[in-house]
């Protein structure tokens, strides 16, 4: 007999750090384009899996010396390699008990909606009453409805085990498993360090409110376009300034910001990434704050930030070029 406890034990054995279970009826009232019941109408359980972002994968950016590791080992490698591997094996495990399982994983590259929920117009419903493919299950909301954690002001998902340091995978199954209670939000105390240390996208004033699973939730109204540029190390050039940081990828008017040492935006790692900011506000500042309060179960013998944070002054000449003259 397949039980929730067996599923959680198998998930840990196969590489997940967290596993929690919800029921599809918790999505009642969700937008059709984000409702998992349209993907598997006979689903009895929704399973959320958490995969830690190693604190060490952020170390190179914190020191300003090794930037690619977070984008590879803490970001793209998790999303494109590690999470799919674990999810596929978990789906096989459940199907060996005779229950169909869909390993949605972390990615939805063919989704019908954009980052703010608007239809992109690239597909149409196959019949009346159905949403346009592909339906995209909102991962952070799935994590919340499965009882894994909460959505912080930054819009990043927080858990008592790792704070903001995890990525989420989702699975649907026809197996009926005992659900976990929805997580009572309490980790985010609205310190707003995520906003004050973000290089350009998190608002401390504007917010989005939604009632989900019986809870009134609120997070910042994230400017996704600014986040796209800022987390890659870019900021908008003023009139008269050069804006060539992303010109090699067809985007003009962007200059390097103080959080990047690179003259040009680096290439992608595992299909996406270029996460030059290393979650400066939404992950690192949040993590430091929650660790200082003792709210994170994954504890370390030393604090993460050990000296003043660096900043690149692009108005000054490159010291290596000066040394070579």
Task: Give the location of each predicted region.
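Short alpha-helix boundary/capping motifs
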Residues: 39-40, 122-123, 310, 314-315
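Catalytic cores of enzyme domains
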Residues: 30, 72, 76-288, 298-306
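Non-catalytic, usually N-terminal nucleic-acid engagement modules in DNA/RNA processing proteins
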Residues: 1-88
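Short, solvent-exposed secondary-structure capping/transition elements
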Residues: 58-59, 102, 295
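C-terminal/domain-terminus segments
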Residues: 291-321
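Flexible, active-site-proximal loop/turn residues at the rims of small-molecule/cofactor binding pockets
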Residues: 25, 53, 177, 204, ...
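N-terminal and secondary-structure boundary signal
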Residues: 1-14, 30-33, 112, 164, ...
